Amino acid sequence: LHMIHLHWYQYPPMNPMMYPLLLVFMLITGILCLAGNFVTIWVFMNTKSLRTPANLLVVNLAMSDFLMMFTMFPPMMVTCYYHTWTLGATFCQVYAFLGNLCGCASIWTMVFITFDRYNVIVKGVAGEPLSTKKASLWILTIWILSITWCIAPFFGWNRYVPEGNTGCGTDYLSEDILSRSYLYIYSTWVYFLPLAITIYCHVFIIKAVAAHEKGMRDQAKKMGIKSLRNEEAQKTSAECRLAKIAMTTVALWFIAWTPYLLINWVGMFARSYLSPVYTIWGYVFAKANAVYNPIVYAIS
């Protein structure tokens, strides 16, 4: 109780019907996420033709999403059943840490997937091919940096606390400069910087794809045929398709996490607008991003 901010005590208990609705949503989300990401990992690891350096990043993405839902799903179900957080202060901190860690690892994995597509499509033969060693180094870097940032609240730079009485996360209601400085930097690290890199890469990817397609049409017109699709062109077309998949995946991630980012910033600067209902659904909606990735890659 000592970790719960006074802000949450001013609100009456939520409508009892909200919890069954939340429980059903989490049940569907949890099953889809665990099954989808497990299948993704299994297929990529057991199909020799798919065991490429670039797909190591896809496997890492599926693993971080699987870990997120594996650790978030059961506690959320318990919370929905009892209508409040009942798992204690220590597990609250561990729960929040794992959620932040997996979210951070997922977004940076998708950023590196996007950068790899940028390297292949925009730079072409001039770009350095992604090797297994380089992909492994990227993945190691992602997890080391993610752990470094997410472990900081355990050492006094911000802290993990209950939010909305049903979940746990970073302390965005604290008014001290040290706590807020963590949220400023962390928001930049897991949202604004990845977004900037993603937009930059996709702008040039789209330009490269458009230029390639125009060149293909012009060449076909000169040869007096309707299309020009040799083996190299088909390969380029496949790369472009993968770029669209990566773009869709990253876009869905940002759509999922933007509400939670806004909750953090509203909590810092306009907490009177922040109710448990908004917090809970923003939090749950953010976790649902782990469902999107296997669906997008399965369609491909």
Curated annotation (Swiss-Prot):
A motif ('Ionic lock' involved in activated form stabilization) lies at residues 116-118. The chain crosses the membrane at residues 19-43, 56-78, 93-115, 135-155, 182-203, 245-266, 278-299. One of its GO terms (molecular function) is G protein-coupled receptor activity. The keyword Transmembrane helix applies. InterPro entries: GPCR_opsins, GPCR_Rhodpsn, GPCR_Rhodpsn_7TM, Opsin, Opsin_lateye, Retinal_BS. Contains one covalently linked retinal chromophore. GO terms for cellular component: cell projection; plasma membrane. It is found in: Cell projection, Rhabdomere membrane. It comes from the Eukaryota. GO terms for biological process: phototransduction; visual perception. It is a multi-pass membrane protein. The modification N6-(retinylidene)lysine is found at residue 287. Residues 1-18, 79-92, 156-181, 267-277 are extracellular. Keywords: Cell membrane, Cell projection, Chromophore, Disulfide bond, G-protein coupled receptor, Membrane, Phosphoprotein, Photoreceptor protein, Receptor, Retinal protein, Sensory transduction, Transducer, Transmembrane, Transmembrane helix, Vision. Residues 44-55, 116-134, 204-244 are cytoplasmic. Disulfide bonds join 92-168. Photoreceptor required for image-forming vision at low light intensity. Can use both retinal and 3-dehydroretinal as visual pigment. Light-induced isomerization of 11-cis to all-trans retinal triggers a conformational change that activates signaling via G-proteins. Signaling via GNAQ probably mediates the activation of phospholipase C. Homodimer. Interacts with GNAQ. Belongs to the G-protein coupled receptor 1 family. Opsin subfamily. This is Rhodopsin. It comes from Cambarus maculatus (Freckled crayfish).
